[in-house]
């Protein structure tokens, strides 16, 4: 490793990543044909990924200077001793995107004998298709660091650290017209889609005696599957006794003749369903500025912006020419789901000893779900000893914390402290309807319809924004107004060590809220002779509704704890 890497250019200096491209494709087609049925399976798997390969500058010491811009993108500049990076233009230390995509499709088609066994079978066609897809954009950050020395970052124009790390064994000094230490965002998209359709002719033999035979057969099969022989024998004996009891009950109820307890059922029907799901998740990746010694951040003409990131050192000093903004980043999630299904059938049944009966039936259902959530990631500025901040204009702490054993602040205009509320909403709507008409020996009309709904909302402060002083207290001077919205200025020190001077003081509480509403309503129609009294004719079926809400308050504080 060289002892020092000096580099000077009158033009831009770019320390950039390379990208590896990986791609994979798998396809399968398989068809199996039997005497009475066939099955075709198609599989499609595809994925691709762009993998970041970082550039690395590593030496005993590093000194980089540019007459224009310096850009460190998805790469690393590290040294045992001091690292100095100076740009006469802009200085950007930032993350880069690493993209990946995948898609999986499986389709299964069946025809002929779809199911059999017992005393029935179905002949027809069936198709099922499942699809999964993902598109991800992740961030790979840069690192500028010194193991035993200091890191000095200077820009005549803007200095930006985005989704990256600056680390030093000693001090970190960052200077620019405008200084930003902010998060980057990774985005994850996922989709699912499922489809099913089945059409066929079903034939079955039913009746009380048939049920006994089927139950006995199932008991024998269960007994054969049991590993313990004694337990298997007991299962078989129980099955025999249950069958004998069922036959006696049938005879006792006047069903002594076998032909009076047999029926032949034939139906032609179709059923189909479809469901989809789409989700997008955004995850914030914090920048980290951490020093074993002091951290000094200075903007010479404009603002200092800390967004969803962390700054830590022995003593931490912010000196903003204009505004000091310490704000939160946020993670978001959005999910949309939908589903629908329908079925229809025409059937005929002949029960020996009675006349034929016919039936027509159909049903449908539809559902939708929408969910959205936002969570905030506070910026944290931590001084193990003294924390000092100064702004020529406003100091805005909105989704952030400043903490130190002693906190000193000088604000040229307003000091605004505001806590952020995480939020979540969930909405669900469901509809369904069905009807059946019986003709012949089993005349009846029945039907039902229902509508259901869920609506849930939530807002709450998870982390309270503010200024936290240790046993040395705080000394804060604000020229115009101090405004607290669910904010806090707190200290562990005695009262005489805590001082705050402001032109005016305004404050506002933040209400945490949670509410939940759910309800359903339906109607039933049943004209069958066996309909229960409560459902005879046309009756409403009112679902049990639910409603609840809760509130709490985040109050501003300015006190000694």
Regions found by a protein language model. Give the residues of each.
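Binding/recognition "hotspot" determinant
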Residues: 1-561
């Amino acid at each position: 490793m060289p002892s020092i890497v000096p580099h000077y250019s009158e033009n831009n200096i770019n320390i950039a990543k390379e990208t590896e491209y990986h791609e994979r494709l798998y396809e399968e087609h398989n068809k199996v044909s039997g005497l009475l049925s066939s099955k075709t399976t198609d599989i499609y798997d595809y994925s691709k990924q762009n993998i970041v390969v970082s550039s690395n500058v590593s030496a005993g010491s590093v000194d980089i200077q540019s007459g224009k811009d310096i850009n460190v993108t998805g790469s690393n500049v590290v040294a045992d001793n001091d690292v100095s990076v100076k740009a006469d233009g802009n200085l950007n230390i930032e993350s880069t995107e690493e993209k990946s995509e995948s898609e999986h499709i499986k389709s299964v088609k069946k025809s002929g004998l779809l199911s059999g066994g017992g005393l029935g079978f179905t002949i027809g066609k069936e198709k099922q298709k499942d699809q999964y897809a993902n598109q991800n954009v992740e961030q790979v950050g840069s690192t500028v660091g010194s193991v035993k020395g200091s890191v000095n970052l200077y820009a005549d124009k803007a200095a930006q650290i985005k989704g990256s790390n600056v680390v030093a064994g000693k001090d970190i000094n960052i200077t620019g017209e405008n200084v930003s230490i902010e998060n980057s965002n990774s985005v994850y998209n996922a989709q699912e889609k499922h489809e099913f359709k089945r059409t066929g002719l079903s034939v079955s033999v039913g009746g009380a005696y048939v049920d006994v035979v089927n139950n006995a057969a199932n008991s024998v099969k269960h007994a054969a599957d049991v590993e313990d022989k004694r337990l298997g024998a007991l299962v078989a004996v129980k099955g025999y006794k249950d069958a004998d009891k069922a036959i006696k009950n049938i005879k006792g109820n006047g069903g002594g003749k076998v032909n009076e307890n047999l029926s032949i059922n034939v139906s032609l029907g179709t059923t189909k369903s479809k469901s989809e799901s789409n989700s997008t998740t955004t995850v914030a990746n914090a920048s980290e500025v951490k020093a074993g010694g002091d951290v000094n951040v200075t903007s010479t003409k404009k603002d200092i912006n800390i967004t969803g990131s962390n700054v830590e050192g022995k003593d931490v000093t912010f000196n903003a020419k204009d505004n000091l903004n310490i704000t939160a980043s946020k993670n978001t999630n959005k999910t949309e789901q939908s589903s629908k299904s329908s079925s229809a059938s025409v059937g005929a049944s002949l029960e020996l000893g009675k006349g034929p009966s016919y039936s027509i039936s159909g049903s449908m259902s539809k559902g939708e779900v929408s969910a959205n959530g936002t969570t905030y990631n506070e910026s944290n500025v931590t001084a193990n000893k003294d924390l000092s901040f100064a702004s020529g204009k406003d100091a805005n702490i909105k989704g952030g914390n400043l903490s130190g054993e002693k906190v000193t602040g000088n604000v040229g205009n307003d000091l605004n402290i505001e806590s952020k509320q995480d939020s979540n909403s969930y909405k669900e709507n469901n509809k369904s309807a069905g009807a059946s008409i019986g003709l012949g020996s089993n005349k009846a009309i029945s039907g039902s319809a229902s509508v259901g709904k869920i609506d849930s909302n939530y807002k709450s402060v998870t982390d309270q924004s503010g200024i936290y002083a240790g046993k040395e207290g705080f000394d804060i001077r604000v020229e115009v107004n101090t405004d607290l919205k669910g904010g806090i200025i707190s200290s562990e020190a005695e009262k005489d060590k805590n001082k705050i001077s402001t032109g005016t003081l305004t404050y506002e509480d933040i209400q945490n809220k949670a509410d939940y509403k759910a309800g359903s309503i339906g109607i039933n129609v049943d004209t069958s002779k066996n309909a229960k009294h409560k459902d005879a004719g046309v009756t409403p079926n009112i679902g049990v509704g639910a409603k609840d809400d809760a509130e709490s308050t985040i109050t501003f504080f300015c006190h000694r704890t």
